[in-house]
Amino acid sequence: MRTIKKFWNWIKNEEGRTLYFDGYIAQDSWFDDDITPKKFKEELFESDGDVIVWINSPGGDVFAASQIYNMLKEYKGKVTVKIDGLAASAASVIAMAGDEVLMSPVAMLMIHNPSTLIWGEESD
C-alpha cells in the first residue's frame, strides 16, 4: 500500500488537535501531495474538540480554500489560526476561518485582488 504524502498533519494533544498546513492548496491532487478539501474534511470531522491551525502556504485554488474555510467555520470546536510563515492568496481565505487569528511578527499575510490567465490567438 502506497503512503499518501500530505502537506498537512494532525497532532492530538491535551489542548485539542493541532493541524499544520504547509503547501499548495488544490481542488484535486494528481500526486497526493496537495491540501485538498475532500481529504481534509475526512480528517477534520473524525474527532472533536478545539483545533489549532498553523498555516505556511503560498495559496492555490481559491475554490478549494473556500471549501476548507466553510468546513472550519462549521466546526463545533474553537478554531485558532496561527500564521508562522506565509498565508498568501488562497491560504489567506483559510486563515480568516479562525475564531482567533494570530501571526508571528515575521509572518506575512498576503491578500490580493482576483486574477486570471487566458491564452490563445486573437481570433479565438
Protein language model annotation of sequence segments:
Residues 1-124:
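Terminal-region recognition feature
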